[in-house]
Amino acid sequence: MNIFTKLKNAKYVQKFIITLSISLLIIIAGVVMTCVKGMNLGIEFTGGIKVSVEANDVTDKKEFENTLRKWLEGDRGVGETGESKNPDNKKFEIKNVTVNGDNYVVVLGTTMTENGKKVNMLTTKAKFKSGEKEITGYVAQRESQEINSELTTYLQEKYNAGVTVSSSFVGNESAKWVLKSAIIAVAVAIAVILVYIAIRFTLLSGLAAILALIHNVLIMFAMTSIFQISVNQTFIAAIVTIIGYSINSTIVVFDKIRELMKKPSYKEVTDVDIANEAIGATLKRTILTTFTTLVMIVLLAVFGTQAIKEFAYPIIFGLVAGAYSSILLAAPTWVYLRKLFKQADKKPVQKKKKAKNTDKPVVAENA
């Protein structure tokens, strides 16, 4: 008996509480990590300046990164904590430095120091006398231009030539718009899938599938928070990708459930047994398709550039979560929803009537 045969005959619905608890523990761990360290939000969602340094003639990447860090911590008077050596200077907080092939990307957040105190750009309106939004943007653009000029001069002195510096600024209003658009995109995708499954199968199947998708997204967020992976537009693309990919495995399970329920021989079979059989029948397909996809994504995560890795890591989390929910959560959730709504429909209706030869009322139940 091979492993798939053993797994095929397992009692998945009966272990639903255990499998759900495992997912909840991961999600809770992600929430705790988010409360402690926060999400590693990219510049698209926070606003700020991103400086890219392209070093074509540099052979020692580690040395170049150290040189770049020394400039950030020394010449700019700004440390990675955002503290300014000169209290009169307005400096952006340095969030991180990442290596992307030959490009070194410095991401500066929206926190500034003014008169020795940290001031968030969202709260700088009281600090400026007029045109808060315009002035906030102008200050950031001016800093961006200064960074370009100073960093270019510094690196050219160190490496003579072959160094190009460029920067981009994302304002707070733009960051809010990107975040709002991302949330809408995910919500619309989930809503469309709910409608599709409700039409193709049943409303309860659709609800179970949507709960499984929400589980997948929450696991992706939790793991991303635990490992402090950057949350940017690439991450949103990964979420939408997983929503579209993982729903296929879930649909296969519900398609098998529908097929079994149509058979005359299954009319007296319980929902639990039908769900277990449907999971067992589709288990091999779900595992193998997920595994083959994972192999390619893992290779991208290992050998890809930083930008590709930022996409690959959430995809890996999502693929595992998707297979987990398709096998262990979606169908059992459907069983419990069916049980819940059947109980709601079959509540006993109490009628008072007198029994023969007695004055005591009798309670009759309508099934």
Question: Model-derived features: where do they sit?
Answer:
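A structural signal for conserved, well-ordered secondary-structure elements
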Residues: 1-367
